[in-house]
Amino acid sequence: MPLRGAIVVMRGAILAMALAFSVAGTSYAQRIAPFDRLAGNWSGSGTIELSNGSHETIRCRAAYDVLREHSKLQLSIRCAGEGANFDLRANADYSAGAISGYWSESSRGASGTISGRADGDRFQVVARAASFVATLTLVTHGGRQSVTIRSQDPQSTIKAVSVNLRRTS
């Protein structure tokens, strides 16, 4: 019986340590400001879905600069394909889970506001302009990131953009 009791105590100690490390890891992950996960340069490829139903392969580069106590972000996402290009820039602020800021897209001369939420590794943002609304979902897992942009404007020549990126620095 003494051996059996020692095994039970050892299992309990291992379980307690595992629980302590998982809680510590979770609280550490929650302390990381959402923009910190994005910082750096990224590149990859994806597709643009055009309003006529066709798809075009694109290559993309993204740069994220985190500023002022990890609550401000400047981003640039440039993508190019054979016929469709875009150059998206934004400045965003983060506070208590909420994201707000401004965006511009130079090849179409469009600009407007962004608003949304950050939850862990996921950003869900709505970009608005005078006659344009799009949703942007950005998910980061370590050195990988997916970006999906969907136009809510039926007149837009681009319906959706889907890009997978890898951190380069």
Model-based region annotation:
Residues 24-29:
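Sec/Tat signal peptide C-region and signal peptidase I cleavage site
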